[in-house]
Regions:
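Acidic/polar low-complexity surface segments
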Residues: 164-167, 193, 218-219, 240-246, ...
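Terminal non-domain segments
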Residues: 1-111, 480-481
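Beta-strand-rich extracellular passenger or scaffold domains
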Residues: 114-117, 130-137, 157-162, 182-190, ...
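Extended HEAT/HEAT-like alpha-solenoid repeat tracts in very large eukaryotic scaffold/adaptor proteins
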Residues: 299-303
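Blade-level signature of beta-propeller repeat domains, shared across WD40, Kelch, NHL, RCC1
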Residues: 457-481
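Well-ordered beta-strand segments characteristic of repetitive beta-sheet solenoids
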Residues: 105-110, 121-127, 144-153, 168-179, ...
Length: 481
């Protein structure tokens, strides 16, 4: 990290908190004029650029690569063959927990009992039991750039009422690894796989788990990398905003789910100004977000947000800006590889690129249902942006309002492609292969709906089986055998 003064470190912490939490009000978060409150965003971004992010990420990834799960399990099963402690360390046993004081920081080793951890440490290793973590649980902070928790087994509860918890890398690296059990993770902001000028990881290898947090969590990256990875079990994820595969400025947010019938929810707290009392911001579930220049406000290109679910019958519940969407040079991807899935959203979702961005939703198989209540979704590109919804099989149903199902607007490019099955497409207007004309850039918009692989399909706007329709204003609706 480049040398930073205490004032600069304080500015970074306040700026991060302001952008991701304090600026959250019942108003439009895409109206960047509302973000011109102190701390000054330009000062914050210029200070952040002083940090050697590449060096910081390299150090964190070297640690991550050294975390071999098979090695950890072998280590647990053969503790008597390993030397846990080194000369010069101060060892302080207290019941089932041993405190180890080293020149690098505190390490804690817990036995197989039901332990309670309230103190943060450089490293916590728990060998089993139904434990409670009331601390940061693998969260770095100023003055403590690294922290790791490894819990081998048990039905554990991770509870934090403060920011930065449960696998959070803030100006450093934070890692939380849970190797089994039905666990509950409850946190506020910057948690559950969150990286800001650092790397944050939460890895859970199995069980029926529950994750709840507020903002910037569950795989969120901002000038860093945030990762949450689950290998199996029927899991539940609940967040308010900026979560579940969210990438902000120069950030990568990853949410990886291996198997199980999972439920993802994001939204319900902050109303969107376009439909007060009816719609809420999600900014989650594979969403890349940047700051659009507004007046004298500094702009910054968005990051990359990815949600990848390998298999299971899953439910994705979001509202505005969700489910494979990008805003202002951001890239958002939601990929589901197998299962009969339900996607529910409001607007700017389900493969939507908004303002020079890209949004992609791909579903490889299963009988799926897609609902975008207002629209501007389901393969929509708006304002020099691209949006793709790609479904590779199954009997699917698409329901939207307007500007959806292969729609381009404001010089955008939108595609919905469905390969195989008996599919149904319902839309009010401006879609199913529709491009609006915008003359101020001397460019056109393009909208394409492809349905291939045969099947008996239904279209609300006049499409027919085994026929290609060329729509006015650069639109194509093609149903091919």
């Amino acid at each position: 990290m480049a040398p930073l003064t205490l004032d600069e470190k304080d500015l970074l912490h306040r700026g991060i908190r302001h952008l991701m939490v304090d600026s959250l009000q019942p108003r439009d978060l895409t109206d960047e004029a509302a973000l011109k409150n102190p701390p000054d965003i330009s000062d914050f971004l210029n200070t952040a650029l002083k940090v050697d992010v590449q060096k910081l990420l390299s150090a964190s990834f070297n640690i991550a690569r050294a975390i071999d799960l098979e090695m950890l399990l072998e280590w647990k099963d053969n503790l008597d063959q390993f030397s846990l402690f080194h000369e010069g360390w101060i060892i302080e046993p207290k019941g089932d927990i041993t405190y180890v004081y080293t020149r690098h920081g505190l390490m804690i080793v817990g036995g197989t009992g039901d332990n309670v951890y309230e103190q943060d440490a450089l490293l916590i290793v728990d060998l089993g039991g139904n434990d409670r973590y009331l601390n940061g649980a693998g969260a770095s902070r100023i003055g403590h750039p690294f922290s790791m928790v490894i819990d081998f087994s048990g039905d554990d509860v991770y509870l934090s009422g403060a920011d930065h918890a449960q696998g959070a890398g803030i100006l450093g690296g934070g890692f939380l690894i849970d190797l089994g059990g039905d666990d509950r993770y409850l946190a506020e902001n910057f948690a559950q796989g969150a990286g800001v000028l650092g790397v944050g990881m939460l890895i859970d290898t199995g069980g029926r788990d529950e994750y709840r947090c507020h903002s910037f969590c569950q795989g969120a990256g901002f000038l860093g990398v945030g990762l949450i990875a689950e290998s199996g079990g029927n899991d539940q994820y609940h967040a308010a905003v900026y979560a579940q595969g969210f990438g902000f400025i120069r950030g990568l947010g990853l949410m990886l789910e291996g198997a199980g019938d999972d439920r993802y929810f994001a939204g319900g707290i902050y109303p969107d100004y376009r439909e007060p009392g009816k719609a809420y911001l999600s900014m989650s579930q594979g969403f890349g977000y940047g700051i659009r220049p507004w007046g004298d406000l500094a702009g910054a290109s968005g990051g990359i947000g990815i949600l990848d679910d390998a298999r299971g019958n899953d439910q994705y519940l979001g509202d505005y800006f969700s489910q494979g969407a990008g805003y202002w040079y951001g890239l958002g991807i939601l990929n589901d590889s197998a299962g009969h899935d339900l996607y529910t959203a409001g607007r700017y979702s389900q493969g939507a690129g908004i303002h020079l961005a890209a949004g992609i939703l791909t579903d490889a198989s299963g009988d799926d249902h897609y609902l975008a209540r207002y629209g501007v979704s389901q393969g929509c590109g708006h304002d020099l942006a691209v949006g793709f919804l790609l479904d590779n099989g199954g009997n699917d149903r698409y329901i939207g309002g307007t500007l959806s199902q292969g729609a381009g607007n404001g010089n955008g490019f939108g595609v919905l492609s469905d390969n195989g099955g008996n599919d149904e497409y319902y839309l009010r207007d401006q879609g199913q292969g529709h491009g609006n004309t915008e003359t101020f850039r001397r460019l056109d918009s393009f909208g394409i709906l492809f349905d291939t692989g045969g099947g008996k399909d239904r279209y609300s706007l006049g499409g027919h089986n085994n026929k290609v329709n060329l729509h006015p204003q650069w639109g194509i609706q093609a149903d091919l055998p």
